Amino acid sequence: MQIEVAEFGKMSQSGNSLLKLIQNNDLPILDLLVREAVQNSLDAGMKVEGHDSVHVDIGIKDVDVPGFAKHLDGITERLIEKFGDSPQKAIYIEDANTTGLTGSLDFKYSPNSNIFKLIYGISMAQETPGAGGSWGLGKTVYFRVGIGLVVYYSHILNEDGQYQHRLAVTLVENEKLPNTIIPKSNEKVPSGIAWWGQRVSPDSDDTIPITDEAMIRDILDSLSIQPFEGERLGTKIIIPFIDEQQLLIKHDINPDDNKPWESNVADYIGVAIQRWYAPRLANKKYTYGKYLDGHINGQRLEKDDFLPLFLELQMMYNAAAIGSKTSRYIVNDIQIRNYFEHNKVNNAGRVAYRKFTKKELDMLAPLNGPSPYTCVNEKNPLGEQNAPMMAYVRRPGMIINYETDGEWCKGLHATEESEYLVAIFVPNSNTKLMNPDNEVVDLEAYLRKSEMADHTSWADIIIKGKPFDIVEKIRSQVRRKIKASYENKEEVKGKQGLNTLARNVGKMLLPPTGFGRRASSRNRGGGTKPTANKSSRGNSFTIVSQKYLDTGDLEVHFQMRLSKNVSAFTIELFIASEGGKISATDWESEDSVGTPFPAKITRISFPDTVGLFGRSAAQKSNRKVLHAVRIEKISEPVECLGILVFNCTDPHVQVEMLMKPEGSVVNGQ
């Protein structure tokens, strides 16, 4: 292959400047590689029909240094001298069911082609709607993984409908360092950038990818890489001469934690794919296109291989993206006003969250698994207590970041040492903006444009000269919903494994004030021995027993005693919380949970009470949920048994059943 050295000129890039374009020092280099490489592959698979997944395989191969170096004109001896005396490794990234490096071999005839954007161009933004890439700078991470040498191989269907193998090589190095690899010319300023391929013409210094299949197979064989065969389309990027120990430099955020994946590059990459692509990896429920069929060294990453945290994140993502009811997580709609064409309750998206125990995350002996903070390379800023962990993601399924403090977590309460609050926000990407511009027409485009080049955060932007605050409103709504939920709801404490959800028998607790006691909609029968709650005027309301019916409804048997001066009474359902009871009106308020009240009365009866009660009136909430019944009473003392049946759509809450007498001095009347 013949060499083409980039000329250094006005407004041109140099190797040194390219290597600094996306110098993200917050993430390990292997995380940056996984985020960029997998996203490129997923973007390349968007328009290929006939497949429900995008195949991505990342792994390590041996390098035959002399066999590889002989093909690179101008640096053959230098490579053999520098690397020939010791075993060398390469990282490869393979994708299939993708378009490949299409376009004219000579990029001058197709400057917007895939082949130019990946091999010969820089800062070429990805324009496909819903794509992950946007700035065109992320691919510079390839040059930082090894010595700056990258091999691009692709098998495509060309413009003539013929299958074609293509291969090119790029080298980007810091031209300011001593002992550079690219040969120097006395007549030219070093640029630090070179390509290898075949000459466009005998009298030109420009190169294009080679298409000689025999030569391509020989080059790939020197890198222990198999070519694509038959009709299989895709791309393989090979980065030779890596230093595995250098790539595994540890970020000692949690130095005492167990991190077995940091022992070798392949294991680290396997966890990194889970870390950043949990929503899409092996997820056949992914709603925005093809799921990610991930492999490490040719072995498929199955869900059984996931760390527990990442499997939970995927299930939470599905719950938020689909909006399905779930007994495992809390899912809240996020609504933003004044920016979108409609004001549906979930116009901005949904947030799913839950508090996990150490046992649920396999952190206890004998497994002794890592904490959530260790899994995502984040520090717990609170020390003895556990800070909340917030993830957010947009349509391509790559988690943008994990936050444990800052704007996403501000005001959220810490959990105790044995619990971890984990949340994920999934935007409603298709929501249209009220006043769009040519580039930003929906929420997905807004969030995409708001990202920095390394896609690690969202920040509000200006559209048509007007500053928007959509991201800030989303963060504020997410915080408020999570905070209100745990202030207004008593979380399920049942034992829940990864694949099964077992309901435990809980205790029926007395309410903090008023008459009545709680009926636990989440417990399958049983409870503490009931005790009567009496007033000084002789009124009382006692839960005698409760049981689940075959329909899933809860049947509550109670005993009631009412004095002569009680003219009527109301039996009402509330949701119990640490701060007191929550009525249906308060629950459904936009300033509170904002969803239909989860507990609904289906039947109430009083056996053997003929002539004791008068008219009854059902009371429904604003969202038509029957949550209370008011019943008139004769002017005589009454002592009777009653039966109330209700169902509850949210197992994360505990229902409180109260009786409110009217005409009673005790009741303030």
Go through each PLM region and give its residues.
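Short helix/loop capping segments that flank catalytic or ligand/cofactor-binding pockets
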Residues: M46, P66-A69, L101-S104, G161-Q162, ...
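Active-site-adjacent bridging/hinge elements
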Residues: Q2-S17, A90, K108-M124, D205-M215, ...
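Flexible ATP-lid and adjacent glycine-rich G1/G2 motifs of the Bergerat
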Residues: L79-G84, Q88-G161
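Charged regulatory segments coupled to nucleotide-binding catalytic modules in large multidomain enzymes
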Residues: M1-M11, Q246-D256, P260-I273, D305, ...
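GHKL-type ATPase core
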Residues: V54, D62-A69, D73-R78, S134-I296
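Short, flexible loop/turn elements at secondary-structure junctions
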Residues: D43, I60-D64, D95-G100, V141-F143, ...
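Long, low-complexity, polar/charged, intrinsically disordered or flexibly structured peripheral segments
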Residues: G103-D106, P111-I115, D160-I219, L223, ...
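Bergerat-fold GHKL ATPase/HATPase_c domain
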Residues: M1-E94, T102-F116
